[in-house]
Each structure stands twice: as structure tokens, then as C-alpha cells.
Amino acid sequence: MQKIGILGAMREEITPILELFGVDFEEIPLGGNVFHKGVYHNKEIIVAYSKIGKVHSTLTTTSMILAFGVQKVLFSGVAGSLVKDLKINDLLVATQLVQHDVDLSAFDHPLGFIPESAIFIETSGSLNALAKKIANEQHIALKEGVIASGDQFVHSKERKEFLVSEFKASAVEMEGASVAFVCQKFGVPCCVLRSISDNADEKAGMSFDEFLEKSAHTSAKFLKSMVDEL
């Protein structure tokens, strides 16, 4: 039986996922988190929210792979838009991710770079292709682009401009790069799907609170369509 890991960062991001699948989930505590295990259309799915930030999402992704043996990881959640063509509730799939808060420039390394690693972390081409196929079938304007991750909630014009100029990023959040990094190191295909909840500007906090639930549901509904075809 195929095993699929499904992650969000916050409870609000996985609640619609659990509701949409509509199966009985067993709750399994591990590493300070709760993993929801169930069977959907002859696929074992493991759902969890990591809590916010790169450390938490690294722990949860590693647990999914090593303790539950998931063979694919799908991340569903919300993000802040960095570009004009990404509006509230739009969907974006990450082609690459970057840790925008990594700075070893004192040692002449480029921003985002860690020795024995790389600036950009790749996601699964096959999973992204599936996402695009589903988007075409459902007439959804799915966008592709670089997503920047860091342990800060971006809410300023200056930081937005930096992320675009330095990394050519389309959106910003706080977990995707670490999830993709863990998956890459363990050889597990990964897809990071985000729905836009704010514009990462001075009004981002208010916008995030207002649109979190709607945007999380948009991402969750699309993710379920992907699982249906895996």
C-alpha cells in the first residue's frame, strides 16, 4: 500500500484536509506532535501539522519518513505573495525553495548558502507535473515559482523587495524549504503547495488572519485532488 505524508504548519492548515478525506484517523503521538493515520482509496495517508518554523517542520518531516515510512510528502498551506500576479487565494506550487534567512556572507558565501549544500532546493518534477495536469483539468490558474522560507513573518516592503531581487522568489512562508531539504536528503519526492493569504506587506498580519481559513481550504482541496490521482 502506498504511503503518503501530508503536512501543514498550523492546525488551521490540516483541519480542512482531515475533513475533506472523510476517513477515520488513528491519532499517534510522536516527538511532541500528533500524526493522523488513515486509509483512503487503498492508500495510507499520514497527516500532521508541524507547528510554525523550519525547526518544527524539519522534525515532523523526518518523523514522517523514518517512523511512518512515507514514500511521498505533500505540503499544503498558505503563504505571502511577493509578486503582483499572485493574488489572495491564488495557488502556487514551488519549483525550488530557499532559506532566505541564512547569511554566511562574512565567509564570502552567497546569501541562502550553507557549505556542503546549495542555495536552492528542488522539489519533485513528477509531482509538480501532476499538479499542473490537475490544474488544467479543473481550470485553475496554478502558478509555479520559487518560494522563500525563513523563521520570520515577512511584513515589509523592503524585505519583499530583497526576496525578489536576491532569490527571484514569488512567495514567502516559514517551513517549505526545510521540508523539501529533508525530503531531498532521504530521496522522498516532495511537493509544496501554497495558497496566498497575504501580500507580505505592512498589512500582512491583518490579511493573514482574515484569509487564513479560506486560503488553507483552497490548498487542501487541491491537494486532495492530487492524492486522488497518486
From Swiss-Prot:
Superkingdom of the source species: Bacteria
GO process annotations (BP): L-methionine salvage from methylthioadenosine; L-methionine salvage from S-adenosylmethionine; menaquinone biosynthetic process; nucleoside catabolic process
Xref: NCBIfam families: MTA_SAH-Nsdase, PRK05584.1
Known regulation of activity: Is inhibited by the transition state analog BuT-DADMe-ImmA. This compound is also able to inhibit H.pylori growth and is more efficient than antibiotics commonly used in ulcer therapy.
E.C. designation(s): 3.2.2.30, 3.2.2.9
Alphabetical keyword list: Amino-acid biosynthesis, Hydrolase, Menaquinone biosynthesis, Methionine biosynthesis
Active site: 13, 198
Assembly mode: Homodimer.
Keyword Hydrolase appears in the UniProt entry: yes
Keyword Electron transport: no
Encoding gene, per UniProt annotation: mtnN
Catalytic activity: 6-amino-6-deoxyfutalosine + H2O = dehypoxanthine futalosine + adenine; S-adenosyl-L-homocysteine + H2O = S-(5-deoxy-D-ribos-5-yl)-L-homocysteine + adenine; S-methyl-5'-thioadenosine + H2O = 5-(methylsulfanyl)-D-ribose + adenine; 5'-deoxyadenosine + H2O = 5-deoxy-D-ribose + adenine
Record protein name field: Aminodeoxyfutalosine nucleosidase
UniProt enzyme class: hydrolase
Described purpose of this protein according to its UniProt entry: Catalyzes the direct conversion of aminodeoxyfutalosine (AFL) into dehypoxanthine futalosine (DHFL) and adenine via the hydrolysis of the N-glycosidic bond; this reaction seems to represent an essential step in the menaquinone biosynthesis pathway in Helicobacter species. Also catalyzes the hydrolysis of 5'-methylthioadenosine (MTA) to adenine and 5'-methylthioribose. Can also probably use S-adenosylhomocysteine (SAH) as substrate, leading to adenine and S-ribosylhomocysteine.
Binding site for substrate: 80, 154, 174-175
Molecular-function GO term, any one: methylthioadenosine nucleosidase activity
Family in the record: Belongs to the PNP/UDP phosphorylase family. MtnN subfamily.
Pathway note: Quinol/quinone metabolism; menaquinone biosynthesis; Amino-acid biosynthesis; L-methionine biosynthesis via salvage pathway; S-methyl-5-thio-alpha-D-ribose 1-phosphate from S-methyl-5'-thioadenosine (hydrolase route): step 1/2
Pfam families: PNP_UDP_1
Stretches of the chain forming a coiled coil according to its record: none
Gene3D superfamilies reported for this sequence: Nucleoside phosphorylase domain
One Gene Ontology term, aspect cellular component: cytosol
